[in-house]
Curated annotation (Swiss-Prot):
Residues 192-251, 269-315 are annotated as: Disordered. Belongs to the papillomaviridae E2 protein family. Residues 276-292 have a biased composition (Low complexity). InterPro entries: E2/EBNA1_C_sf, Nucleotide-bd_a/b_plait_sf, Papillomavirus_E2_C, PPV_E2_N, Reg_prot_E2, Regulatory_protein_E2_N, Regulatory_protein_E2_N_1, Regulatory_protein_E2_N_2. Binds DNA as homodimer. Interacts with protein E1; this interaction greatly increases E1 DNA-binding activity. Interacts with protein L1; this interaction enhances E2-dependent replication and transcription activation. Interacts with protein L2; this interaction inhibits E2 transcriptional activity but not DNA replication function E2. Interacts with protein E7; this interaction inhibits E7 oncogenic activity. Interacts with host TAF1; this interaction modulates E2-dependent transcriptional regulation. Interacts with host BRD4; this interaction mediates E2 transcriptional activation function. Residues 300-315 have a biased composition (Basic and acidic residues). This is Regulatory protein E2. It comes from the Viruses.
Amino acid sequence: MAAAERLSAAQETQMTLLEKPSFDLKDHISYYGALRTENTIFYAARKKGLTSLGHCPVPTLATAAANAKAAIEMQLLLKDLLRSPFAKNDWSLNDVSHERYKAPPSDTLKRKPRIVEVIFDKDPQNKTWYTLWDEVYVCTVDGWTLTTSGADATGIFVNMQGSRQYYELFGEDAQRFGTSGTWEVIDQNQRFHFPPSSRADTTDGLPGLQEEPRGGDGPTCSGPAPAIPDSPSRCLSRGFAGRDPGCHRNRHRVHPYILSGGQRILVTSSSSSTVQGPLSSGSSQHSQSRGRPPSPDSTETERARTPVNSDRQRAGEFDLLKGGCRPCCLIEGNGNKVKCLRFRLKKSHRSRFLDITTTFWATGDEGSDRQGNGTILITFTDTTQRDLFLGSVSIPGELSVRRITISTD
């Protein structure tokens, strides 16, 4: 079936580019081209009444159309960026994702994020966090322009032609989470207060901007490590234009949590739900006293611990021949299907094996052209675990499975 083959080729291209740590805009343009082809095929198939192509389910017409339009938008945008002086910058696929492009300030490319902390009512437990971008790329009729975003006591803004265009207003959350109408903004080694304690607290003619010294004369605040929003649920859904302080909305709150080594991630929680994110395995709903507004920082969460075997090395280490020999499985077949299987195994069956490799191929006598099928190698603690894995995990029939044992001479 020609459509199924074209779909498989487009998905194979996407998987290859997703696994490739590229900073080249040309690779990202190819990725969105493959994404565009995939959703165009889905749209045509759904129009004909098909619900699947091969083993791949076909999304609804609306979903396929929206995904195709997003891919076309990003493909054209990156082609335009490729012709600009900024094409020489290192652009990761995450930097040019459609989700980040639409995140506030919307319809801009953004890099180098940092976290701004806001404390309401002078209560260290009543705080929330916002994302600020050191580099904001705006496409205008005159070409691409590089600007920055910043924070003050009013909110977070983008500098556009010497004026501040706010895309986040702290007063909105102060009405929801505070009682006194006061808050403190901490941006790296700068602090701003609202309302100002005196006329001297006004900076640049804007009320409430109290900037503390950058040197040793005043308190400093070390900025948290950058955290990048990867999906619309982690971004504040608002546009690039200025905001009306009287406008209210129900937005998601973003919580940074500290991992080992001091690294931080963003975990999003709704105002009325438990924390949800890639690290939350068990969350407890919080209760609020009737006389106090909900605190943005009042939700607790636990770090999820991926179940792994006791035979595992420390994180990041891999020893194929620990103990002298290792029972394994080789799974071979269509590269895209093998990659999809590996993703499913890591997501749903992580406790059933020891380690799993990336997808690899044999190469020809010259160059790096791939030959044969895509292959993954799965290792186990012993043959019993391997037998349990093969007996409980469903593997597509078109993929071949070989039991092998690797040992030293």
